[in-house]
Every structure is written in structure tokens, then in C-alpha cells.
Amino acid sequence: VKRAVTDGVLIVTGGPGTGKTTILKFVIEIMEHLGLQIELAAPTGRASKRISDTTGREARTLHRLLEYNFNNNSFNRNADYPVEADVIIIDEMSMVDVMLFHSLLKAVAKGTRLVMVGDVDQLPSVGPGNVLRDLVNSDVIPVIRLNEIFRQAGRSRIVTNAHLINRGEMPVLDNIDEENDFL
């Protein structure tokens, strides 16, 4: 939480149930308490609604944040007209492609903090690039990796097996319910 408040750029990554959203809520509360103007966004409408519902704060799609202009197929927010915020927080960063990330970076004003949150082990964006994975592997941007499962649903076989597979371990295949489990 401290790094998200103090670092200029930060990535928070972890699998399902590791506490990304919980940390995000604390970070937002602290930043608001400090009087910082925060913009919260995600790549899709569904993702922005989910983060808005879980944090209780307004979140927008990246296209809305950057003010997409349908007439000229570009964004109104850019280096000449950046997003007005002290902090920009992007959730579900694994879904952001190279072109959208480039547009976002152009619209980040000097001195604005950028916090990117997502699961590096999710499928990459539909568009070109695997931005989150490339940023995490770059060793240029500070990365906080969350590994421990806290969510109660984390005890489900699907979540448990996803974490085992990500660590290169064999999934748990005992007690398979042929009607409800898929192999």
C-alpha cells in the first residue's frame, strides 16, 4: 500500500483472491485522505463497473478516460491535453494492448502517478502485445507480487488448481465429480 502512495509508477499483480482489490480500496482511501485527485479506469465496461462496485468510487473505461473521439478515430486526451489527475489507477491491466497503453502514456501528465493492477498470468489482451507481462518482466517498473490466496472462494478447486499450474505443479485431480467438474 505504501509503495502505491509513494512511487511514481507501480504494478500490483497476483492471481484471483490474492487481495488486489482489497489493496486497491486501501490505496484509494489513503490517496483521497491526502487530498489527491484519482482517476480509476479499466479496459472494458464490465471491468470498470466491477471495480466501481467493489471500491464504491466512479470508474470509467480507458476509452472514456482518454475521451475517445469517434469522428477522427483518436483520443482527445494526449500529451497536449493530458488527463487531469494526481493518480491514475488502471485495473485489469492484462487486457490492455500496446496501442491503448501508448495512448494512455501520452495522456499521463508530468507528475501524475500511475498504478497498474492485474493478473500477469491471465490471457493477454485481444489486441497486439502482452503489455502487463512485458512491463513486469522489464525490471524497470517496481512490481508488487501477491501470492497468497485470501478470498474464501480461493479454496475452490478451480482457483487452487490455477495457482498450482502457475507454479508448475500438478493440479489436484482427486474426487472428480463427473457431472460438475470438467477435465
Where in the sequence are the language-model features?
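Walker A (P-loop) phosphate-binding loop of P-loop NTPases
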Residues: G17
